[in-house]
From Swiss-Prot:
InterPro entries: Rbsml_uS13_C (IPR027437), Ribosomal_uS13 (IPR001892), Ribosomal_uS13-like_H2TH (IPR010979), Ribosomal_uS13_bac-type (IPR019980), Ribosomal_uS13_CS (IPR018269). GO terms for molecular function: rRNA binding; structural constituent of ribosome; tRNA binding. Part of the 30S ribosomal subunit. Forms a loose heterodimer with protein S19. Forms two bridges to the 50S subunit in the 70S ribosome. GO terms for biological process: translation. It comes from Lactobacillus acidophilus (strain ATCC 700396 / NCK56 / N2 / NCFM). This is Small ribosomal subunit protein uS13. Residues 92-116 are annotated as: Disordered. Pfam families: Ribosomal_S13. Located at the top of the head of the 30S subunit, it contacts several helices of the 16S rRNA. In the 70S ribosome it contacts the 23S rRNA (bridge B1a) and protein L5 of the 50S subunit (bridge B1b), connecting the 2 subunits; these bridges are implicated in subunit movement. Contacts the tRNAs in the A and P-sites. Keywords: Ribonucleoprotein, Ribosomal protein, RNA-binding, rRNA-binding, tRNA-binding. The lineage of its organism: Bacteria, Bacillati, Bacillota, Bacilli, Lactobacillales.
Length: 116
């Protein structure tokens, strides 16, 4: 089982799909990583040679992924909350941040309805 960026990649999936299991790598980035590393997108994770794994690790290390990315996102949200911006207040209150209406919807962010 290939282990890249602290994530065990699924064995039976194509490498371009398996790379998307790493937080911060989507479809387009996975394809770019495979192209830059010179690894075929159609090869399965279990069929990777150790050399291919090293090439992929080197390419993934160029990106901000997993713990570093999660930390950066949480620090960005913390900064908004600390400066008291509108977006920070919405984060603190658990309401939608990007301007969605909340009169009828936004149940996911607001939680279940409380009895009146």
């Amino acid at each position: 089982m290939a282990r890249i960026a602290g994530v065990d990649l699924p064995r039976d999936k194509r490498i371009v799909v398996a790379l998307t299991y790493i937080y911060g790598i989507g479809d387009a980035t996975a394809k770019k990583i495979c192209a830059d590393a010179g690894v075929s997108e159609d090869i399965r994770s279990k069929d990777l040679t150790p050399e291919d794994q090293e090439k992929l690790r080197a390419e993934v290390d160029k990106y901000r992924v997993e713990g570093d990315l999660r930390r950066e996102v949480s620090m960005n949200i913390k900064r908004l909350v600390d400066i008291g911006s509108y977006r920070g207040i919405r984060h603190r209150r658990g309401l939608p941040v990007r301007g969605q209406n909340t009169k009828n919807n936004a149940r996911t962010r607001k939680g279940t309805k409380r009895n009146r």
